[in-house]
Design a protein with these regions (language model features):
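Acidic, divalent-metal-binding catalytic cores of TOPRIM
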Residues: 1-293
C-alpha cells in the first residue's frame, strides 16, 4: 500500500530537488501527473534560462492554496498553480502571493488542439495513415462544434454549484452516442432539464435560474473558445478525443495519464502565455529582492 504523505512533507521534499530547478512549482494532482506537468512546462519556458525538471503535486486545490498561504520560505522563487474549476464562471477569487489560478477549468484544457490530437493519433496508429488522412478521420473542428451543448451543461453545473453548494460532474461517457463517438445532444439536454427540475424542487425560482443563466451567457459566448475554457478537459474533452481516436483511427487502451502526456508533447502553447509570464515574474521578483538585500 502506497504511503500518503502530508502536504507539509511534500513541500519539504522539494528541498532535495532544488539543484534541478530554478523555481519550485507546486500543483494539484498526483505523482503520476509529474511527467505531464514537466513536459508541458519545459516546453513553455524553453526559450528562457529557467530550469524546471521537477514539480511538486500537493493533492487537491484546497491543499495547494493552504500551502501557498502558509509558505513563508523565501529562500527560493516558487509558484503554486491551481485550476480555475467550475468557480471560473461565477466567483472572483482573492489574489494570493505566489498563487497562479488558471483561466480555464483545469490544466488539461490547454493541451487540447488539432495538432496535439492528430499527432497523438498518428503516433499511436504507427503511421499507417498519413497525417492528412488522420485529420480527415478525426474532424477536430466538427467534433468540437457538435459538442457545444456541453457549454450549456457546464453553465448549469455552475448554477447548481453556486446556488446549491455542490454539483455532480458525471463523466462524459454518460453523454456519449457510443456508436459514432460523439456527444449525444439530446442526452445533454435531458440532463440539463434534470438539473433545472432539481433546483426548482429546492425552491429556487425560475426567474433566479434564468437570471443566473443570462449572466453566464453574457460572459461566455457559445463558441469553441468557451468550450475549451469552461468544460473540464480532464473529465470531458480529453476522454472525448480518446474515444474519437479509438473509433475513427485505431483502438488502443491507455491510462488517462498517458493520453494527456501525449497531448502535452505537441499542443499549441499560446493559451499558456499568462502562465509563462507568471513563472518568469516569480523568478524576477525573487532576484530583485535578493539584490536589494
Amino acid at each position: 500500500m502506497e504511503t500518503e504523505f502530508s502536504t507539509e512533507v511534500k513541500q519539504v521534499a522539494a528541498v532535495f530537488k532544488e539543484y534541478r530547478n530554478s523555481i519550485d512549482i507546486y500543483t494539484e494532482d498526483k505523482v503520476e501527473d509529474k511527467a505531464f506537468y514537466v513536459t508541458l512546462l519545459q516546453r513553455l519556458i524553453k526559450d528562457t534560462d529557467i530550469k524546471i525538471n521537477d514539480i511538486h503535486p500537493l493533492g487537491c486545490k484546497a491543499d495547494v492554496i493552504s500551502a501557498c498561504k502558509t509558505d513563508d520560505d523565501r529562500r527560493r522563487p516558487c509558484l503554486y498553480i491551481v485550476d480555475g474549476d467550475i468557480y471560473l464562471q461565477y466567483k472572483t477569487e482573492e489574489p494570493v502571493e505566489n498563487l497562479y489560478r488558471l483561466d480555464s477549468y483545469c490544466i488539461e484544457n490547454y493541451v487540447i488542439c488539432e495538432e496535439s490530437v492528430c499527432q497523438t493519433a498518428y503516433e499511436l496508429n504507427g503511421g499507417r495513415f498519413s497525417m492528412d488522412e488522420i485529420k480527415s478521420r478525426i474532424n477536430y473542428l466538427g467534433v468540437l462544434m457538435n459538442s457545444l451543448s456541453l457549454i450549456d451543461l457546464f453553465f448549469w453545473y455552475s448554477i447548481q454549484s453556486e446556488l446549491f453548494g455542490e454539483f455532480e460532474l458525471r463523466h462524459i461517457n454518460s453523454y456519449f452516442n457510443m456508436r459514432n463517438a460523439i456527444v449525444d445532444n439530446q442526452i445533454v439536454s435531458n440532463r440539463i432539464e434534470e438539473i433545472k427540475e432539481g433546483l426548482i424542487n429546492h425552491n429556487y425560482t425560475k426567474e433566479l435560474l434564468e437570471e443566473s443563466l443570462i449572466k453566464r451567457e453574457e460572459k461566455f459566448e457559445k463558441s469553441i473558445d468557451s468550450l475549451l475554457k469552461i468544460v473540464s478537459g480532464k473529465d470531458f474533452l480529453i476522454p472525448l478525443f480518446c474515444n474519437v481516436i479509438n473509433h475513427r483511427v485505431c483502438s488502443i487502451s491507455l491510462p488517462k495519464e498517458a493520453w494527456k502526456y501525449h497531448f502535452s508533447k505537441t499542443c499549441n502553447l499560446d493559451r499558456l502565455g499568462e502562465l509563462k509570464k507568471a513563472i518568469i515574474s516569480a523568478c524576477l521578483v525573487y532576484q530583485q529582492k535578493n539584490t536589494e538585500n
